[in-house]
Amino acid sequence: MNTDNPKSHISRIAYPAIIVFLILTLLGSLVERFHPFTSWLTPPVALLMGLAYALIFGSTHRRANKLGSKVLLQYSVVGLGFGMNLGESLASGRDGMMFTIISVFGTLLLGWFIGRKILQMNRNTSALISAGTAICGGSAIAAVGPILKAEEHEMSVALGTVFLLNAVALFIFPSIGHWLALDQQQFGTWAAIAIHDTSSVVGAGSAYGEEALRVATTIKLTRALWIVPLTLVFSFVYKTKGAKRFPVPLFILFFIGAIILNTYLLEAYFPEVGRFVASLARKGLTLSLFFIGASLTKEVIASVGVRALLQGLFLWILISVGSLAFILLI
């Protein structure tokens, strides 16, 4: 960070001040009498605040943004498990399994055709965007990148494409859901299938309702487990060796453990504890979206490029419309 730039001096004050303000507002929202003053701070608003900060001040506090957007998000997702019941979650995951299988393989095939045959993109960038769209955004890209031996700029382009579309999805999906009068189950399923990254899926579900949040989170994290077979498929198709590990996101296992603990212990003996932890986790999720927005600088947006954005956009539209039509027809 350039200390001679006046913006850098302002950002050193503004950044922690904004975070403290957000934390106090979110904690205040846990108290019922403060709701009229705190209800405005929703996940989309937090993301928008982060975007505004990034566009004004640029790339500052990268370490804090990375910790907030990844670690805080993962802790928050685990915390959401303390508000879920195992039987209901298994039912949601089972209901969404067919959508998941069709959409994962369909997205990978469409991504290959659009990226390589129509847009004539290089192999790695096209494959990374397809993987990020098919599974769970940045996590899938990070898992597949080493297998493809992708260059740093190829990873950056794919991540930038996915993050930009995620930001858009967080704003427009709840509005479309209300316009189409989707119920909580329908919207949660649609968000989990059509939105790439876990953060935006959970954010959109939270904005739509508690049941939509539960359904979306369960289906999305079930979908995220496809990272393991995805890495195996990519290793076979692209004939690459030397991938040291097939990353199973550890927070997903903790999320499952939280659901089990809540179902068999907290719901029976300490129901208030589970509800409080889940409520606190939703606040943490909202805060993590500020960090994600603050990471989307002008440089990230500029790095994407037209063809990468077109592949991501075409895939996203096809998957969104196709999955929505399927949900409405069944």
UniProtKB/Swiss-Prot annotation:
Protein name according to UniProt: UPF0324 membrane protein PG_2004
Q: Which InterPro entries match?
A: UPF0324_pro (IPR018383)
Main location class: membrane
Which residue ranges run through the membrane? Answer: 13-31, 36-58, 71-93, 97-114, 126-148, 158-180, 248-270, 285-307, 312-329
Q: Known Pfam families for this protein?
A: Cons_hypoth698
Q: How does it sit in the membrane?
A: Multi-pass membrane protein
Question: What are the subcellular locations of this protein?
Answer: Cell membrane
Keywords, in A-Z order: Cell membrane, Membrane, Transmembrane, Transmembrane helix
What protein family is recorded?
Belongs to the UPF0324 family.
Q: Looking at the record's lineage, which domain of life comes first? A: Bacteria
Cellular component GO terms, alphabetically?
plasma membrane
